Amino acid sequence: MINVLYLDDEAHNLTAFRAAFRRDFQVHVTTEPTEAVRILREQLIEVIISDQKMPKLSGVEFFELIMPDYPDPIRMLLTGHADIDAVIDAINKGQIYKYISKPWNESELKGLVEEAAELFHRRRAMATEGAQLMNRMSEARVHAARIRRMTADQDSLSASEIADIARMSGEITDLLGG
């Protein structure tokens, strides 16, 4: 089940969201940014929805605040005010996935949350594959270094064998009166 965190200063919006999506998603709601951070710390949240206009900090400011510690959840900004500056800020600072206007349409929002969760899991899979690839590359470097050392040892061994043969050849020549 998709874990969704919804931050909004208006409790009735949170109640409506929980009622609409409690069967579809694992819904976490709060009016407080500090509580939202606690939820992020304790739960694997895939999608975060935040209202833009809140008294303590804006949705964009909240996303900026959590980005360093929680970069993976997919972020969506929800607002009843079409503010182009907020949209630009959200895109540039908060790295939002979607900007959603209030009032939201239940089926559209459900689809957006599902798409966002899919993106979350694709990114995680890619990160895992990237880490595995980096491990394989590291192992390949170690193996290549080992081969270079063995080749260098073999080359120096061949040089010493050649020196021994030359020395013995000289001794044989001396013995034969050469």
Protein language model annotation of sequence segments:
Residues 1-12, 16-21, 48-49:
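Conserved acidic segment of CheY-like receiver
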Residues 31-32, 58-61:
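Acidic catalytic/metal-coordinating carboxylates
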Residues 78-79:
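Hydrophobic/aromatic residues positioned on beta-strands within the core alpha/beta folds
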Residues 128-178:
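C-terminal output/effector regions of signal-responsive regulators
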